[in-house]
């Protein structure tokens, strides 16, 4: 079970809703994955009740999955705050995935503006899930601002590279043991999702890896199983890696010279 801001969710997978081949494939993918939440950009659905936006919103409601609006595309504090406030009105929720991009090529979050925007939104009653880097100090500043969960990236959005800074992510997990950490962006394979879950991360958010795959519906299922398996492995307590071989069969009854070291 995933707990965020005091609310419990049955799944540790969050799923984006952009760039699917058809609305029907999106709906089937969501139903197959059964995610905790589905993310959506206000700019994607439109605002003002036009036909396209209303139809997309109706499709999301049909899934029965809670919606997590995001501020995708925002590059200033004011823009992000305004978008979040509009999203609250449109989707009738205090949840917001806060995105504030600082570089157009890498789509890397601007952590300085991110902290400022998070402070404003939290004071305004939002439940903020900030998309951030794996930088420990930046993450601490976001927690100081009032965030109760973080969404560090594995790699730049849409790259599918997996956890490119594994050491930093592991340190982040180690140093923030009580903070829900959801890996957001950069995962391309179910095995990569399972890996970060095995490290102890609390959840995974995906979009491109599913929506742009050859078969989004089956890929959604694959990722859902990977996230579940990775978490189960973490909770089971994996054996530690070692450099020396260790027999798994008992040695009782074997000749004494079998235990000699050469």
Curated annotation (Swiss-Prot):
What's the Enzyme Commission number for this chain?
Answer: 2.8.1.10
The record's annotation in CDD domains points to: ThiG
UniProt GO molecular function:
thiazole synthase activity
Which cellular component terms (GO) are annotated to the entry?
A: cytoplasm
Q: Give the pathway annotation.
A: Cofactor biosynthesis; thiamine diphosphate biosynthesis
One Pfam family, short name = ThiG
| Catalytic activity, as annotated | [ThiS sulfur-carrier protein]-C-terminal-Gly-aminoethanethioate + 2-iminoacetate + 1-deoxy-D-xylulose 5-phosphate = [ThiS sulfur-carrier protein]-C-terminal Gly-Gly + 2-[(2R,5Z)-2-carboxy-4-methylthiazol-5(2H)-ylidene]ethyl phosphate + 2 H2O + H(+)
Main subcellular location of this protein, as a coarse class: cytoplasm
- Residues at the catalytic site: 97 (schiff-base intermediate with dxp)
Q: Which UniProt keywords apply?
A: Cytoplasm, Schiff base, Thiamine biosynthesis, Transferase
Enzyme class of the recorded protein, top EC level: transferase
- Which superkingdom does the taxonomy of this entry point to? Bacteria
Q: Give the residues the record marks as binding 1-deoxy-D-xylulose 5-phosphate.
A: 158, 185-186, 207-208
Write out the GO biological process terms: thiamine diphosphate biosynthetic process
**Any idea where this protein resides?**
Cytoplasm
- InterPro entries according to UniProt: Aldolase_TIM (IPR013785), Thiazole_synthase_ThiG (IPR033983), ThiG (IPR008867)
Q: Which family does it belong to?
A: Belongs to the ThiG family.
Assembly and partners are described as: Homotetramer. Forms heterodimers with either ThiH or ThiS.
Primary role: Catalyzes the rearrangement of 1-deoxy-D-xylulose 5-phosphate (DXP) to produce the thiazole phosphate moiety of thiamine. Sulfur is provided by the thiocarboxylate moiety of the carrier protein ThiS. In vitro, sulfur can be provided by H(2)S.
Protein name, per record: Thiazole synthase
Question: To which species is this protein native?
Answer: Neisseria gonorrhoeae (strain ATCC 700825 / FA 1090)
């Amino acid at each position: 079970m995933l707990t965020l801001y005091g609310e419990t969710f049955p799944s540790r997978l969050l799923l984006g809703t952009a760039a699917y081949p058809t609305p029907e494939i999106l709906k089937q993918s969501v139903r197959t994955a059964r995610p905790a939440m589905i993310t959506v950009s206000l700019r994607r659905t439109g605002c003002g009740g036009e036909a396209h936006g209303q139809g997309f919103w109706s499709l999301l409601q049909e899934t029965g999955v809670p919606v997590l609006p995001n501020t995708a595309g925002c590059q200033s504090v004011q823009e992000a705050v305004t978008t979040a406030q509009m999203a609250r009105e449109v989707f009738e929720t205090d949840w917001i995935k806060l995105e504030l991009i600082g570089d157009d090529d890498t789509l890397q979050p601007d952590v300085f503006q991110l902290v400022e925007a998070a402070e404003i939104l939290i004071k305004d009653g939002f439940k903020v899930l900030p998309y951030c880097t794996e930088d420990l100090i930046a993450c601490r500043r976001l927690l100081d601002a009032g965030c109760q969960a973080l969404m560090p990236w594995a790699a730049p959005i849409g790259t599918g590279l997996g956890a490119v800074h594994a050491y930093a992510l592991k340190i982040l997990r180690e140093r923030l043991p009580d903070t829900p950490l959801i890996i957001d962006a950069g995962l391309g394979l179910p095995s990569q999702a399972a890996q970060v879950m095995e490290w102890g991360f609390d959840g995974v958010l995906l979009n491109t890896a599913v929506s742009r795959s050859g078969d989004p519906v089956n890929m959604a299922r694959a990722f859902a199983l990977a996230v579940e398996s990775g978490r189960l492995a973490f909770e089971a307590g994996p054996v530690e890696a070692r450099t020396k071989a260790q027999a798994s069969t008992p040695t009782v009854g074997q000749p004494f010279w079998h235990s000699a070291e050469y």
